[in-house]
A protein has these predicted regions:
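Long, helix-rich interaction regions
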Residues: 1-456
Length: 456
């Protein structure tokens, strides 16, 4: 919470907690600051740095995280948190001041030092967070610095000696954020070629799929043609779904880049619909539905709606079908998705996905349904969490008063009141996406540690 607030004055206490100092121990009232608190303090430091435009605040945040990185202790939760905290420095690549340029150099040097250290294969999981963090810091480009890292990560895909699988995954993710399409920069063709080569010949399945996704993020007609070939002829259960998501991301980025004149890609839409109908695997179908949503191919809406009615007992598939409809902004789906929400009282994941889909479609009436569910005498933690998350995502200001009333209602269960507070926090958040989306975006989520992927 101290980090989410973005208040620079919180940095002092967050740094003491992260470094497990005497003052930090006094703040916790314990003989030492526990691992979980230290890790979240590191994330908090990164959040403060992200929100501040003051280079001195960013430098103060860096100094604290650098101290954690230089500790001999390699407790993975703490190191992973510090690395991802450093990725949130939010430094300007254009028109940067001399102080900001120096800080960028210092942050990169800190990350490089850890990545290049000879610490044994046991640290591969921790190190795998460095390439995506560096990519997040410097973004896509063609400077000498960008070329250095792109070459480094291309080599990391094909090392002379076998690396840990997490490092292959990290390299693929980073290249997807750093490289440019061949049409934009001819010399970057080798990075897309390297990703294709790894997909075709690489040994780690997850790194192969990340390579496909990276091609979509890089973009360009050559990569699109390649991905459409995989979508048509690849393995049905895994390769085709990853190619579909990659193509969906590519199309979404095209719409974002050219908001006024970008048209619907009918050829891609038809190919995705064919996969949706032909491939029977539920997880694959979920991916195709989301991809169709990202492509805004509303001609597929009727097929997705029919599938939702047929398979609404399959929570994961039904949830993603709802998301797909919302991504393509198919307004006629509101009523049916609202009914899914009402019928999903004991199915928290479907409830959450369907409610978020309605929020994306602009249906504010669902908040009345959700606040009503939150007031029920309920001890199902997953359900309450799903409701609170959905209310926070939708962000309807009209829910503030009923949620405040619930917060102070002694007749409700303590859990209901607690999650009313959680929902209020989400509604009040001035940003469109949840606070942790900055950390989650384009990271190696397969290199997971407890404090990164578990909220409890």
């Amino acid at each position: 919470a101290m980090g989410i607030s973005g208040q620079p004055k919180a940095l002092v206490d967050l740094a003491e907690l992260a470094k497990d100092t005497e003052k930090g121990r006094k703040l916790t009232g314990r003989s030492q600051v526990d691992t979980r608190t230290r890790a979240f303090a590191c994330y908090g430091i990164g959040m403060v740095a992200y929100r501040s435009a003051d280079i001195d605040v960013k430098t103060q945040a860096f100094d604290a995280l650098k101290s954690v990185m230089e500790e001999a202790n390699n407790e993975r939760n703490i190191k992973v948190a510090a690395i991802n905290g450093l990725s949130l420095m939010n430094l300007q690549s254009d028109n940067a001041s001399e102080k900001e340029k120096k800080l960028t150099v210092d942050v990169l040097a800190c990350l490089d030092k850890f990545f290049d250290s000879k610490a044994g294969r046991g640290t591969d999981l921790i190190k795998s967070h460095v390439p995506p963090s560096i990519a997040k810091l410097i973004g896509r480009g063609d400077s000498k610095l960008h070329q250095k890292y792109k070459n480094d990560y291309l080599k990391a895909l094909f090392p002379k000696k076998k690396s840990g699988n997490d490092l292959y995954r990290a390299a693929a993710i980073a290249l997807g954020q750093l490289a440019q399409a061949q049409s934009e920069l001819k010399t970057d063709k080798k990075y897309s070629d390297g990703l294709k080569k790894y997909f075709e010949n690489g040994k780690d399945a997850q790194a192969r799929y990340f390579a496909l996704l990276a091609l979509g993020q890089i973009g360009g007609n050559e990569n699109k043609t390649y991905l459409m070939k995989v979508l048509s002829k690849g393995n049905k259960a895994l390769e085709r779904p990853w190619a579909a998501i990659s193509l969906g991301v590519m199309d979404f980025l095209r719409f974002e880049k050219d908001k006024k004149s970008a048209g619907i890609d009918v050829t891609l839409g038809k190919l995705l619909v064919k996969q949706l109908k032909d491939v029977k695997n539920p997880e694959a179908r979920a991916a195709f539905a989301v991809a169709l949503g990202l492509c805004r191919y509303t001609d597929a809406a009727a097929d997705i709606m029919n599938m939702l009615m047929k398979y609404k007992s399959q929570d994961e598939l039904a949830g993603y079908l709802c998301i797909g409809l919302s991504l393509m902004n198919y307004q006629p789906a509101k009523t049916d998705i609202h009914n899914v929400v009402k019928e999903s009282v004991r199915r928290p994941e479907l409830l959450k996905q369907a409610a978020i889909a309605l929020g994306k479609l602009g249906d504010k009436t669902v908040t009345t349904t959700l606040t009503g569910m939150l007031q029920e005498k309920e001890s199902n933690l997953a359900k309450l969490s799903a409701i609170a998350s959905a209310l926070g995502f939708i962000g309807d200001r009209r829910t503030i008063q009923p949620l405040k009333k619930m917060l102070f209602d002694d007749n409700l269960t303590p859990l209901s009141r607690a999650f009313a507070a959680v929902a209020l926090g989400g509604v009040a958040d001035k940003e469109k996406l949840p606070w942790n989306s900055k950390i989650a975006r384009n990271m190696n989520y397969r290199g997971s540690v407890e404090t990164l992927t578990q909220s409890g």
